[in-house]
Each structure stands twice: as structure tokens, then as C-alpha cells.
A protein has these predicted regions:
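Ligand-binding clefts of soluble mixed alpha/beta catalytic domains
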Residues: 1-388
Length: 388
């Protein structure tokens, strides 16, 4: 009987629901976990969890719509939950949330990253206020884990209503282009209230949040490449705030010269140049991973390595607005600096900035307040800081 239950729990949705997921270009919850983690490393928690028999609900599938457990990425332990859109549309209910609460508590005790693969329809309205209350437990744990263990949210389908706030409180947000979206209110409600007609992708798609709102830090073409990108990001991060980031052996000499900088940086301060090329010339093997590349492009934030050690780089980008600091770039850089400081990543600043952007919109939008965030972040940081 136990073997039969486990077999049922491993494929709780219908064949039709699973096929529809694939037809939309999306992977199933367990397929995503298999791609994210090292082969054979996944250990599942609460496989047979479901609604209690006296709950009054006839539909009581195992897992309750979310797959939870731990495994390894490049041999390092991580905790992961993957919402299953084939069960209740991935909507959050009481048991669903309890599994995530347990997972987050364990990750915090162990000191390992938390990765959420989001693909769900928000709160399970059939369960009423109980499901809404369950969000509070997730939000609370997001805050308790902030700056203690890395938290990564991967949006791989719908994420609407209250469900959007947990990813917003995590350290990094990935989105899959064309198949994922985040918004508080759906387009139909927006049209009813404001009269604005907008599609799901225009309102809350990956490109919209990567380029306009700044909610999304990394975008990918499909599920598989997105999960590979998550693995790559983890290679720059420690497991928790008491550890150092991974050191990677390199053949790039630490004492090499960079004569190409003479050609990249023009003699006149009035001529623009690409700061990304400067970073590429300096870091190990020319390899770096840019943070929030599409948003506030007048400042470049990136993870890279020098001598095999991870560093966080903040550089003004003369190719965009002459590298001037405005509201969005100040907020972007401040968040990046504070994240690096939390996880013991030294900071290097490549400075070429004419100052803060003047203008009525900037002043009324709070450039003083937002600019102060960047100053605060640098002054607060206790990691080594180098200005170039």
C-alpha cells in the first residue's frame, strides 16, 4: 500500500494537465528539480502530505501541489520547493504552505540556500482566509532568512496577487521569457479599474520586470536555460553568511597587466566607452555575471572573480546617460552592495560619474532619498572595498 501511495504521489496531476504543461513549453515540477540539482541528490520531504480526511474536501492529492526537499548543486547543499501547476493550478493552500514553512525553517537551521520554483495561481480561494494567512508565514521566514542564507526565486509560470511578495523579498529573482509573469492584479482587473488594456506579458512579463520595474534580475529563454543560470549564480555565493564564497582555481595570473585598457578608455572625458569591456579585461578569464542588466543600465553590477576569489563589481556605464546616477541606478547599486556585504563578497567600484542626474522628475521622485540608499549601503558595508 505504501509503494502504491508513493507511486501515486510522484504523478498526482492528470495526464492531460501534464501534457498541457509541456505544450506551453514548460517543464513539470519534478523535471525542473532534476535539472537544477546534481543527479541523484534530491531527498524529498513530505511526499505523502495532503489535506486531512476531515477537511471536507473530496479532492486530496498527495504533495498538495508542491514538491519540497533538499539536494546539492556542485556538491553543496540547497533546499528547494517546486510548485506543481498540474495540481490545483499550483495554488497555495494550508498543507502546501506548511511544507514550505518546514523547508525554510530547515534551510535556516542548516545554513543552506533556499530556491523557490514558482508556477502557481496564487492563493487557493476554496480554503478561504486560511490560505491567505499561510502567506504570512512565508513572508516572515523570508525576512528571518534575509542576509543569512541566499534566497532565490525562479518565476516559471504565473505568479499573481499575494504570491508576488515573497519573491520580491528574496535576494535574486529569475524569470523565463514568454511563459512567466508577475503582477498584483490581472489585466482584466486593470482594465475594469483604470480602462487600460494590456496583455499579461506587457503588464508583468519577464522583459517588463527586467527593464522597467527592476523586480527581475535575470531572464532566460526557457526553463532549462533558466535553471542552468541559477546553478551558475550559486557558484558565486556562499551557503550562508558565516561562510566565504567558493574559490575556483584559475590559470589567469593575478599580477598580469591590462594594456588593452589604454584602447578601451578614451583620452577625452567627453567620449563614452563601454564599462563592460573594462570589467571583462580585468576579471579572471574575462568572465562575469551581470546583475539586473536590463534595468538602470547606467550602472553595471556584476559578480566576477579575481585570483579565483569572488568579487562584486559596481561600475558607472558611460554608454548610458554618461554613467550618471539617478533614482533607479542608485536603488539597483544599493541593493547589490548590501547583498554582497551580507554574503562576504568584497566590492570593487569602477568610478567614472559626473554626479547625480538633475531634473524636476528626479527631485520630485526622491533622488535625495534614493541616492542616500547607495551612500548608506557603502558606509554600512564591512567587506573589503576598493575604488578604481
Amino acid at each position: 500500500d505504501l509503494a502504491k501511495r508513493k507511486e501515486e504521489a510522484l504523478a498526482p496531476g492528470t495526464d492531460r494537465a501534464r501534457q498541457r504543461q509541456h505544450d506551453r513549453g514548460k517543464l513539470l515540477a519534478r523535471e525542473r528539480i532534476d535539472l537544477l540539482l546534481d543527479p541523484g541528490s534530491f531527498h524529498e520531504l513530505d511526499l505523502l502530505a495532503r489535506r486531512p480526511s476531515d477537511s471536507g474536501y473530496e479532492d486530496r492529492p498527495y504533495t498538495d501541489g508542491v514538491v519540497c526537499g533538499w539536494g546539492t548543486v556542485d556538491g553543496r547543499k540547497v533546499f528547494v520547493f517546486s510548485q506543481d501547476f498540474t495540481v490545483f493550478g499550483g495554488a497555495l493552500g494550508e498543507v502546501f504552505a506548511a511544507k514550505i514553512h518546514k523547508l525554510m525553517d530547515l534551510a535556516l537551521k542548516v545554513g543552506a540556500p533556499i530556491i523557490g520554483l514558482n508556477d502557481g495561481a496564487g492563493a487557493r480561494i476554496q480554503e478561504g482566509v486560511v490560505s491567505l494567512d499561510s502567506y504570512g508565514g512565508i513572508f516572515y521566514r523570508n525576512v528571518q532568512a534575509s542576509g543569512v542564507v541566499p534566497q532565490i526565486s525562479v518565476i516559471m509560470g504565473p505568479c499573481a496577487g499575494g504570491a508576488v511578495y515573497s519573491p520580491a523579498m528574496t535576494d535574486f529573482v529569475f524569470m523565463v521569457e514568454d511563459t512567466s509573469y508577475m503582477f498584483i492584479t490581472v489585466p482584466d482587473v486593470v482594465k475594469t479599474v483604470t480602462g487600460e488594456e494590456v496583455t499579461q506579458q506587457e503588464l508583468g512579463g519577464a522583459i517588463a520586470h527586467a527593464a522597467k520595474s527592476g523586480v527581475c534580475h535575470f531572464t532566460s529563454a526557457d526553463d532549462a536555460s533558466c535553471l542552468e543560470d541559477v546553478r551558475y549564480l550559486l557558484s558565486f555565493l556562499p551557503s550562508n553568511n558565516l561562510e566565504e564564497p567558493p574559490v575556483v582555481p584559475t590559470d589567469d595570473p593575478v599580477d598580469r597587466l591590462c594594456p588593452e585598457l589604454r584602447d578601451i578608455i578614451p583620452p577625452s572625458s567627453n567620449q563614452p566607452y563601454d564599462m563592460a569591456k573594462v570589467i571583462e579585461a580585468v576579471v579572471d578569464d574575462g568572465e562575469y555575471y551581470e546583475y539586473a542588466q536590463r534595468w538602470a543600465p547606467n550602472v553595471v553590477c556584476a559578480f566576477a572573480r579575481l585570483g579565483g576569489h569572488v568579487v562584486g563589481i559596481v561600475g558607472n556605464q558611460p554608454m548610458h546617460l554618461a554613467g550618471v546616477l539617478d533614482i533607479e541606478s542608485s536603488e539597483k547599486a544599493a541593493r547589490f552592495v548590501r547583498t554582497c556585504d551580507a554574503f562576504n563578497i568584497p566590492l570593487i567600484s569602477f568610478v567614472d560619474v559626473p554626479g547625480f542626474l538633475p531634473g524636476v522628475d528626479q527631485e520630485h521622485g526622491g533622488i535625495i532619498r534614493h541616492g542616500a540608499k547607495l551612500l548608506y549601503a557603502f558606509c554600512e558595508a564591512t567587506v573589503p572595498r576598493i575604488q578604481v
